[in-house]
Amino acid sequence: MINWQVLGQLIATGTIMLAGPAVIVLLALKKGNL
């Protein structure tokens, strides 16, 4: 069986770790363009 709770936590953690830097880069680019 697949432990969906653990799988969900891993996906959520991975998404946050990837999305954090991406948001910072996007904000930096937007400020740079202004």
UniProtKB/Swiss-Prot annotation:
It is found in: Plastid, Chloroplast thylakoid membrane. It is a single-pass membrane protein. GO terms for cellular component: chloroplast thylakoid membrane; photosystem II. Keywords: Chloroplast, Membrane, Photosynthesis, Photosystem II, Plastid, Thylakoid, Transmembrane, Transmembrane helix. It holds the Pfam family PSII_Ycf12. GO terms for biological process: photosynthesis. The chain crosses the membrane at residues 9-29. InterPro entries: PSII_Ycf12_core-subunit. Signal peptide: none annotated. The keyword Isomerase does not apply. NCBIfam families: PRK13686.1 (NF010239). HAMAP family: PSII_Psb30_Ycf12 (MF_01329). PSII is composed of 1 copy each of membrane proteins PsbA, PsbB, PsbC, PsbD, PsbE, PsbF, PsbH, PsbI, PsbJ, PsbK, PsbL, PsbM, PsbT, PsbX, PsbY, PsbZ, Psb30/Ycf12, peripheral proteins of the oxygen-evolving complex and a large number of cofactors. It forms dimeric complexes. A core subunit of photosystem II (PSII), probably helps stabilize the reaction center. Belongs to the Psb30/Ycf12 family. This is Photosystem II reaction center protein Psb30. It comes from Phaeodactylum tricornutum (strain CCAP 1055/1).
